[in-house]
Amino acid sequence: MNIFVTHPDPLKSAVVLPDKHVVKMPLETTQMVSLLFSPWYYDWGKVLKKDGTPYDTTKGAFRNHPCTKWAAESMYNTAWLIQHGCSLVHEYWYRYGKIHACAKPLFEAKKIFHTMTGEIILCYCMVESFTRAMPNELKHNTSIDTFTAYKTYLASKPWVASNYLRDPSRKPDWI
């Protein structure tokens, strides 16, 4: 469970992620959004899976994860997470030519967000800071910003450099 924040723009942050993250991060994002919409946080209702069943949030798994807590700190953070999730499923479609199972739940979450807050999702640009869920040497490094910390964290994984098979042009220069 993480949000790889490589850029303040959630779309740009999604586009540079490796194939593996483009496949798995939409589900992790949807699970976080489901938890935010549950009674553990906002109590805005259930996020439904593609098959119409709700994501199970009764046990509140990951409710204390730093990324979930960050997303719950403000509606702007929540908007950023939802828009990032929508950007991830769009990137999945671009790379794989298929609709990700989390596309519908994330776009429905966007509608719920608007209904409950009266804000449009573009309010994500009001995010003031992001959390760092990464090894301590990067998490506590005040000499670099959060975007650089996440880029460094991703680049440190040996498998990442060769994980842009679907579209090598998506591989950023910091990998």
What does each model-identified segment do?
Residues 112-175:
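Aromatic-residue-lined binding/catalytic grooves and analogous aromatic/hydrophobic interfacial grooves
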Residues 84, 107, 121-122:
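Phosphate/pyrophosphate-binding catalytic cores of soluble transferases and nucleic-acid-acting enzymes
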Residues 1-100:
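An N-terminal structural lobe/cap that precedes and organizes the functional/catalytic core
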Residues 100, 107-113:
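Primarily interfacial, aromatic-capped hydrophobic alpha-helices that serve as membrane anchors
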